[in-house]
């Protein structure tokens, strides 16, 4: 019984984590969420994470690197992206969301940051 409970918890946690690999110069994201929030943690490479509240023009820029691990919080109502700043190296990012992706209610809306 305890084992089944642990497996259920692990499944829930695993569904909310993803590892994303971006080629040099690639921008990913350009979307926002109504309720979902996320953490982006670059574990290898260098990136620019940008966020903008959807009702403003002010862009928040976070330069991050796998050399100094830190989490950047993506808030609901903020369009966001992540840009691989390298010309030669892949960017590896660990992403966590507070809720698992639901294809029937994706809560993901395209909107460029800039």
Regions found by a protein language model. Name each.
Residues 29-31, 49-50, 71-74, 80-87:
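Short beta-strand His + acidic residue motifs that chelate non-heme Fe in jelly-roll/DSBH
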Residues 54-76:
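Short acidic-glycine-tyrosine-enriched beta hairpin
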Residues 35-52:
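Glycine- and acidic-residue-biased ligand/ion/polar-headgroup-sensing regions
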Residues 10, 46-48, 68:
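Structural motif
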Residues 28-34, 41, 62-64, 83-85:
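Short histidine-centered beta-strand/loop micro-motifs
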Residues 1-13:
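Single conserved hydrophobic/aromatic residue that forms the stacking wall/gate
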Residues 18-36:
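Conserved short histidine dyad/triad with adjacent acidic residue
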Residues 56-58, 83-114:
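Double-stranded beta-helix
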């Amino acid at each position: 019984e305890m084992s089944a409970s642990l497996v259920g918890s692990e499944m829930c946690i695993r569904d909310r984590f993803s590892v994303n690999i971006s080629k040099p110069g690639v921008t990913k994201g350009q979307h926002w969420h109504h309720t979902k929030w996320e953490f982006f943690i670059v574990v290898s490479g260098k990136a620019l994470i940008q966020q903008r509240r959807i009702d403003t023009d002010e862009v928040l820029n976070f330069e991050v690197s796998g050399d100094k691990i830190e989490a950047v919080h993506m808030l609901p109502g903020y369009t966001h992206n992540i840009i691989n700043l390298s010309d030669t190296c892949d960017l590896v990012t660990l992403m966590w969301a507070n809720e698992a992706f639901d294809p029937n209610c994706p809560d993901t809306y395209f909107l460029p940051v800039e």
